[in-house]
Amino acid sequence: MSLKKSPFFELRSGSVDTLLFTVKTTDLDALRTELVKRFEATPEFFADDVVAIDVRRLADGERVELADIRQMLNDVRMRPVGVVALATQGWAGEAGLPLLEARDRRVSAAKPDEAEPAPVVADAVAAATTAEPAPEPAPTQISAGGQTLVIDRPLRSGQQIYAKGDLVVLAPVSHGAEIIAEGNIHIYAPLRGRALAGVHGNHDARIFCTCLEPELISIAGIYRTTENPLPADILGKAVQIRLEEEKLMIEPLRLT
């Protein structure tokens, strides 16, 4: 093999962070029912996120059909990219998904049943609909039905805000943070994470932002990601985003 550097591509070692979907049961019917139930209220919460299937919490001798779990995750618009398993779970490599090495250091090889559990996607979704804001970190805050929710603190990576009415954000939304509203979203600061308005099909919802640098924007399920770069005349600028004939329209805002 030639070691000459190619001007067209490059292979390098690297790492990519993903969500872990931790399987704690072999009852796939119950798992499917719970997964659908959790995603009904916020179907876009983890839409298009990559996820690794973590089977380390299963008891010795237990196994699941990973192909079925893969399909479940696809059905809720998540993208399984691999499996995290213990060395004794050789069957995990039979599903056609690569075996991944988790870096969370939360499962002890000697006594996995006593280890702190790895992140669970289903638990994270539950937080989107049931949790009270926690001081450190505060993963989710939810407004009362129909009321405007005002957030005046910066949102860090991994934090999520859900508003049942309109949402007003007065501080930066960092990469990896997510703001979701059933109504309009107003962001008077840089948006570098995700903003999803009109999540229950409100096509009249809009997003207003004074500095647009997003990972994802969405209205009523119609979304745009950074895979489709924003034009220079709106990137980092004040804009409004609305729907017109099922297309996202991003228009400059004249603030003076």
From Swiss-Prot:
Gene Ontology terms: biological process: cell morphogenesis; division septum assembly; regulation of cell division; regulation of cell septum assembly
Tagged with keyword Cell cycle: yes
Pfam assignment, any one: MinC_C
Keywords: Cell cycle, Cell division, Septation
Superkingdom, taxonomy of origin: Bacteria
SUBUNIT field: Interacts with MinD and FtsZ.
Family: Belongs to the MinC family.
Function noted in UniProt: Cell division inhibitor that blocks the formation of polar Z ring septums. Rapidly oscillates between the poles of the cell to destabilize FtsZ filaments that have formed before they mature into polar Z rings. Prevents FtsZ polymerization.
Protein name listed in UniProt: Probable septum site-determining protein MinC
